[in-house]
C-alpha cells in the first residue's frame, strides 16, 4: 500500500506534460491550489481507489457481522443491548443526506479521517482477540485481518487526498478513543460475546458511513454532483 | 305480582343473554411488524399484520423511539403506505440509527402490543425498478446489427449526488423461449446486445440494486421485433450450397456402393486361406489351367504337337491274373516318375506314388487287369472291347477323376464309384496325375475285380472293364466352363467277351486338345504313336451317350458302326437293376439336352457337366 501511494505521487511529474495536452473539460476544482492540471487526474484516481477500498471494507464488515451473529448470538436479542454503544457516536457525523450535503467537503473529509483513525485500535485488537477465541472461526478471522489492513490503506489514501484537497492545513488528529478492550477479554462468555457483537455491529455501521461519505465526496468533487 | 315476576324473569333472561354475547369478545391479538423498506435511503415504510381482532373494531397505533433518544414518537403517516402501514418521511428518517418500533392494537376489550422491531434504514434499502426502458435495433455500417437497450434509474433514487450507487441487470428472451438470458450491466444505464436471432420478437426487462441493499423487482416487459436480416441473395446462396453438398454426398454414396467391395478389400485384404504350395484354387476354378500348371512349373498344357511322343502311352490290360500291366513310357516324358522310383522327390506335393509301400504292394503285385495301374500320368485309358476304340477328347478343363466299374453293376454289387477327386486335390504337375489316387482306385478296383471274378468266374470281364479315369488337367487358357471330359470306360458286363482285349492307343492330341485314340492294330502296340496315318485310325470324337454315372460313350465320328455295337452290347446285358437303371439313364441321356452339346472344331462334345447335373 505504501508503495502504491508513493508510486502515485511519483507519477505526478510524468503526467504533468501529458495532462497539459489531454486534460480538457473537467469539473472546475477549486481544491487544487497550485492550479496544476495534473492535480485533478490524480485526485480522481485517489478517489476512485478510496471508494473501492471503502466499499470493500463495508462488504467484509457486513459479512463478518452476519456470520458472527448466525454462529454465536442468533436469537439472543443482543441488538437490544447494542443501542447507542458505539464509541464513535460522539463524533458528530451527518445522519442523513441533507445533512451530509450541507456539510462542506473539507469537513466531511475530516470526519472520514476521524472515523478511520478511531478504528485503528479496535481493529488491531479485534484480530488478536478473535485469534485467541476457542475454535477461532477462520472466516471471521481472515475477514478481520483483511479489514484491518484495508483500513490502514484507506487511511493513508485519505490523508493524501486531504493533502491535495486541503494542503497546508493540518488539523489536530481527532478521533474517538476505544475502550472496549477489557470487554473483549472478559471471562464471562456471554459478556464477551456481547462485546464482540457490539464491536462488529459498530464496525459495520461506521464502514458504511465512510463508504457513503466518500461516494458523496467523489461525486461532488470529481463529477460535480453529476454521477 | 305475577306480572312483575314474569317481567323480572324475562329481564333476567335477557340480561344473561347479553352477558353471554359480551363474553364472545376479546382483546385484540398481537400484531406483527413483518416488513420495513426504504426505496431510496431517505424514507421508509413499515407494514404490520394485525392479530385477531377479537370481534371488535380495533385501533392500531405505531410508536417508535430512536437510538440515543428517549422520546417516543408516533407514526407520522398511516396512509401513504396503505393499510396497516406507517410511512416515515424524510424528516422523520435518520440513517445509521436504530429505530425501535412497536404497534399497539386496541379495542374495547383491551389492547395488545407487538414485539419491538429494531430497524436501521441503512440495511433495508430496496429501490423501485428502473424506468423508461427503451429498445432500438441499430444497423451500423460494416458491422452486424445489434440491440441497444436504454433505461433510466428509478425516479426516487438520488444517484447524481452519489447518495446511492445503483447497479443494473437486464434480461431478455425471444417471445416463445422458456429461459431468460441475463446480463449484468454494472453502473451504466445502457447495454448492447449482439447475439440476436433475426426475425424474432424479443422481450426485455431490467432491475437495479443499490450498493449495499436488495434487488428491485423486474421492470415491466418491453418488446421489440428484430427485422429479418437475411437478404434473398443470402438465401439463394445457402440453397445452392445445400443442393451442391447433397449431390456430392449422393455421388459419394453411389461410388462407395459400387466399389465398396473393392475398397474394402483394398483396405482389409482378405486373409488368404491355406494353400497347397504352388496350387491356386482360384485359377482352377476359373479354368486357367495354364497358369495353374505353370505355378507348378509345368509345361504347357494341352501338350502341343511336340508332345505327341509324350502321349504314346498305353496300358495293356489282360484279364489274366498273371498278366502284368506294362506301363509304357513316354520317351520324353519329363517329370516325375514313370516308375515309382523315378518320382521326383522334390515335387511330391500331394501326389502319392506307387513308391509308397502300402500302395505298392497292393497295386504292383496284382496283375489283374487293373486299369488303374498308371505309371503314365498322362492318360489313363482303359482298353476297351474290340470295338472300343475310343477317342476321347481332352476337354481341358477341370481335373476330375471319376470312374466307375460297370461290371460291378452286373454282379449286383454296388458299383463303386471312383473317388471323385476334387480339383483341389490335384496338386500334381501336369500332365501328371495323382498317383496316389490312382493307386487307391486301383486297389479298390482290384477288390472289385476280385469280387467280380469270384462271383462270375465265367466272365472274363474282370480285366476287361476298366474304369477309365480320365483326368483332365487344366490346360487351356480358356476360362469358363468347368467341363469335365470323361474318358469312357463304360463298358458293361455285356461287353465282357472272351475276345482278347483291345488296346486303345492314344494317337495324338490335337492342338485344340482333342485326343485321338487309335485302335491298336497289333499286339505290341505302337509305341511311338507318332502321327500315324489318320486314315487308318479311327477317330473317336463323338460322345454318343453317357452311361451309368460318369461314363461317356465315345463314338467314332464318321460312322455309327460302333454305336450300333455299343447299343447292341447294351441290350445284351443281362438285366439287372442297375442295368435297368443304366438304361434309364441312357435313355435319358440319349435325349441329352441339346444344350449340352458343344461344338468345337467340328467335333461334337457333350458337356458331361450337364449330365452330371441332371444325374444328381
UniProtKB/Swiss-Prot annotation, chain B:
One of its GO terms (cellular component) is receptor complex. PROSITE patterns: FN3, HEMATOPO_REC_L_F1. CDD domains: FN3. Residues 1-24 form the signal peptide. Disulfide bonds join 36-46, 75-86. Its main location: membrane. Residues 326-375, 454-492, 568-593 are annotated as: Disordered. The chain crosses the membrane at residues 235-258. Gene3D superfamilies: Immunoglobulins. This is Prolactin receptor. The gene is PRLR.
